Amino acid sequence: MTFKFRLLFLCFFAFGTSELFSQNISGKVTHEGSPAAGISVIVQPSGKGVTTDYEGKYSINLPIGKFKINFSGTGFKNVVETVVLVNGDEKTIDVDLKQSNLSMDEIVIVGSRSLPRSSANSPLPVDNIDSRTLKTTGQLSFDKALQYRVPSFNTVNTPVNDATTLLDPYEIRNLGPSRTLVLINGKRKNLSSLLYVQFSPGRGETGSDLSAIPTDAIKRIEILRDGASAQYGSDAIAGVMNVILKDKFEYSSLTLNSGVTSKGDGATYGLSYNSGANFAKRGFINYTADFSQQNNAVRSGLIDLTTEIATFGDPSQPVTSPTNKAIADYLAIYPDANNKNGTGEITAAKFSYNLGIPMGENGMFYSNAGFVSKKAISNANFRPSYWRSDAGLLHPAGTTYIGYGPTFEGDLTDYNGTIGFKNEINGWKSDVSLTIGGNSQLYAVNNTVNRTLGAASPTSFKPGGFSFTNIIGNYDVSKSVLENFSVGFGTEIRQETYSIIAGDTASYSGEGANSFPGIRKENATINSRYNIGAYLDASWDINKNFLLNGTIRQEKYSDFGNAFVWKVSSRYKIAGDKLVIRGSASTGFRAPTLHQIYTQSTQSSFVGGSIALSGLFNNRSKQAFALGIPLLKPERSNNYTVGLGFNPTSNLSFTLDYYSIIIKDRIVYSSSISSNDPSSTLGKILANAGVKTIQFFINGIETKTQGLDFVANYKNINIGKGKMSVNLAGNYTIANEIVGSPNDPVAIKDGGSTILNTQIKSLLTESRPKYKIVGGADYHIKQLSINLNGTLFGKTKFQDLDNGGSDMENIKQVFTPAVVTDLNIGYDITKKVNFSFTINNLFNVLPKWKLEAINANGQTVLNNSTAKNLLEGFLAFSGRYRILGYNGSQFSQLGTTFQASLNFRF
């Protein structure tokens, strides 16, 4: 090809391309005369699209041809305009959208297996939260955003992190992470491999890693606040969280964010990219990449000398005695004892995609997947020279030894993926899918020693880790058999595998690596199980106002057998849709997780000249058998909900729901069992089993949880030239209590011990807020948006015997109510660039606690100022955890944080 020919070809191509796309349509989209921003304008069949700017304007260049222009937005009825473009056309299409009584984002999938319904028409309480609402919180992760938007949802960082730095426990209605089922696009998400063992809410349980889901990948969240075991199987006693991923592509988005606390630490950095494409008539791909870094924020307190001497010195001697003077001299130089307690350092990379490929007129092949890689580093308590020696390994020879600070490092990977095919033939809708998922965690402990090994000890250890995987097959069918009657049925087959990975020998030999002992080789194991379940669901609109829904489900597990559950729900509308009365009754179950069945974490020590084991023993161990501890069986629940919804106008809504959840055979992680009397039956059993102390999982209690949820929204309020929406939602716990006495095995009961001491009972029943209320206002005017949100955290209580001793049998540590206020300001710099600034905890409110006596003995202690001060010191580990105490509170200890975000759309 000659140079001239190439030049001619390029000129022709440029001219032809210019002619091909020189046609244009533009216009303005309004609602009741006001500009409608963020409306999707999609061209079919090409799939090309834009969104309207803050003035409601749009513009698209198109080739010659005939097109359908679809205008759609949340809360509005779709409008479709047909346009024919010839060479050089420039056409204007203005559209005024009408408000829809039923927007697409009000359609909820969760809660029914036969027919999706609007949240207003559902017989069940469902929260429907869009991605924008999550982003205005300014929180870095999905789970923390929910904390400040959903009253019945709770999660918080624990001050003593270790493995929980990788993911924090969460729960709905104070029932722990293992009783909330997490779905992604309606498919079960894998559990984490981490079993929470610290004395914080969620102890002895595991849940999914919510922080693994990129916020920019989320279209909306559906939270069903009702038991749903009949629809979905195990783990849905408290409710179901369904994460709906973005699907139809609207625009690409690049978001840069950075933040810092008011103390100048805890810096955060993030980059998120979301994009995709539309193809064919219904095809789409939407994908997200998210990278973030969170630095350490230190909130250590000053050490109280009196408590420190009582812990590490000799309180019977004066401060001038050699032992006590060493402590006093050290704290004079290092008042915080060199501690770096606070949040850990976390680096994360997250990826997600959602794909749909049309197959024929009604078929759709779909696939979605997510992957996250996280690395976390947290600091253990610093070991001052008067607490621990380092055998000369952690400080240079000839220098003064001041102690050492162990660090914990964790590497986490979490993944999930689904492929499936949906189709409709003669009104029968079918969905067949395969889902895989997994979570693995490997740990390292550095800058510490194994004191048993002395000078031969390494200073870095690999303590092992955990892994969990599942493979799930689903087949679901539904049909509207009659105009007012629909059915759904299906099956699920699930296989789960849980692995415990041993650490290196030095990490567990003797007392193990100081601060985080490793997993012993004999405790490492790989175990699997499978289950198959089938359900039948029917929904009957008896008339236009009266709905009745019922579901039954049968499950079979390879390790414990069968489970049968059912659910009925109903809804009655009065005065059209203005007043809705709804209710449900159901039974549920939760299978013990493989973590609870097989986890064993023990350490050895010399007792009476022989080796004795202490720690967590699984229920299949000979030690548990000797104590008469039975194998775990499923929890059983009875759920009841009754509520009403009031919708006087399309802009005003109010719902109130009462719930009651009774859980029988609830699985708990026991107290530490020991015996001071070797001649007792308990003492003999422990001695014969070679056990010093033992803990285990057991179907130990029956619990009753009752409460109220309310939600109120008022939107589209005209204020000046802008519009405002206000919301108020709350959760109030009427009762969260243990019914009757714990199911103590005979040997333990006769030995004067119990599986649940006061501390564990307190943790289960009163360590989450008694109430939580979230209120806010959202105002938009032209390019400016302002969101003000306040969260009232109610009182929590805790009886910390581990740190406070026996005095805490008569005294409670009470965290007082507090309001945390968040402010988010957004501004559209241009049509495609938005700047957002968030101040979380605007007034720098910190958790505050005090001691309250529950009887005369407790009041006697509190009336003695010396005893009271000493007790307060013990609860905060001599002041190391001055803000939270050793075991956490209702909300973050970081105080005010600032977050800035810059978003580009293209």
Language-model regions, residue ranges each:
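Short, acidic, small-residue-rich periplasmic hinge/interaction motif at the N-terminus
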Residues: 28-34, 38-44, 72-76, 86, ...
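Short, acidic Ser/Thr/Gly-rich low-complexity loop/linker segments typical of extracellular
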Residues: 47-57
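Short acidic/polar hinge/loop motifs at secondary-structure boundaries
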Residues: 58-61, 187-225
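N-terminal periplasmic accessory domains that precede
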Residues: 90-96, 142-145, 149, 170, ...
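Extracytoplasmic beta-strand/coil segments of soluble accessory domains associated
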Residues: 126, 147-192
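C-terminal beta-signal and adjacent terminal beta-strands/loops
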Residues: 192, 734, 792-802, 827-906
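Gram-negative outer-membrane beta-barrel transporters
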Residues: 545, 658-664, 668-801, 901, ...
